[in-house]
């Protein structure tokens, strides 16, 4: 019996031991991956590609091939010191197929780099890892890009992820300036072309692509135009504006001339509806303008222009053959190529220098003479009543009727509106120009306001001509073209000008001025010049389809130069010389002089300013015919307020123009 019990006990023990061993083996088979060897060398025993291709099933049951990892290249990459499982956290064993942890985070290049950068910043080691900061900036740009948006056809996927462009196992951007970096740069189109096959084909056959084949490392590749990470849809304004600027990185001269055109001015203001580089030259299949395949070839150019200048609803009028001789990249620096632009520009510069040299000198000397006289007590304005009859002491002289005053006010308002809207386009890269355009809404609206102001000014000018003509016709027998009441310059104006300069330098008395001084006549006739030059060129630019039907296209190049430069001359002259003559001379302080608003001038001031006319009227007994009561106090106050507002607005415009020039706008 004991023997049987012992045998039974032994059998039971054997069964238990066998069960335990079996259980241990089973547990070992399901042990966590951390207990297994998962270093890079282990991974590479399969993933180096030397044992044939590796395939894994996709969610739809199909198989996909895994890329082989070149051990040598991985060892030279930026990730060389990282373990495979640092990214592939879901892999927990070294058996094929791998057992994976359910719910493990997927590989996320962007978040990993952001976490590393944040850790470096917290540890105050950001300065030691500048490249990581650049990567973090790239990640931020990528997350806002078109590539980071859901794919239209497969919404569960993004348009592109990091590994679509970067081989994460061999990634290593060569240092700038090295031959390797140049080679890497030329390889960019091949990467982009994996998705953008049609664009790659167009680019490869283009002028840029052919240069790449010749190993011209300066040629443009995808990233030069579209950037590397901050990529947005090509139909967006941001893309259109940035790509246009990118063209200028290589084509500097062409871009500078483009910026000077109306197309470029609107573009620089931040609006993308005018023609840009790609609209004229194409985007990928770009050819030199002499190539018959080029959009800008002489046989294709008109058709290209007509894509925008189509005459359709909400589009500019149809471009005509005259457009062909317009030089979109004409400049004032190349006489051999653009002689008409060169000559026009030089003539305008000479005009500006001549006008301002004379009149700023005139103003400076005048200020000095009046200031010196006031300081010495030789000339106290508006108090010369010793010889006036008592009944005239408070009287005013009527100088301008209601029609002229209203015309002057409307003219001033239209000119200031033209300056505001025009100079915003003339200096588009200034912050104030962008603010002005935003206030109007768009350059289109600002352009409409600009033209409305121009038509108002032209209308006032036309009415003035009609009234003047009728007045001369009615008084034809007595009117003297060179008489004292005429605006036509005469010999006395020359003598007065010489006399003024003698007075400025203390070599003679102040000359007695007639009804219209020589500087007032200059102001008057300057309007005729401005209407012809600024108005004429403006009408040409406003109606190019009409002009191009009769004149060659290069007249638009001249019109652009003349319109802008002459407008600057007029604006700066008005807000410096004209303002000084009428408001800021020592005898006129404090401003404003309100004669153009009240229409009258005190008799004392009239005698001081127009002594020759005063003496003539006294001598002929006509003075009383011009005398009127002084305007009421409320009307005078309102006139002063209006005058100060206009002066303030004009000086503000002058400051904005100065900011434009100081910023290198022109």
Regions found by a protein language model. Give the residues of each.
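A generic signature of intrinsically disordered, low-complexity regions enriched in glycine/proline
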Residues: 8, 52, 173, 233, ...
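Short sequence/structural segments immediately N-terminal
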Residues: 6, 16, 24-402, 432, ...
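Bacterial N-terminal signal peptides that target proteins for export
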Residues: 1-17
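Membrane-embedded alpha-helical bundles that constitute the cytochrome b-like, heme-associated redox core
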Residues: 23, 27-29, 42, 123, ...
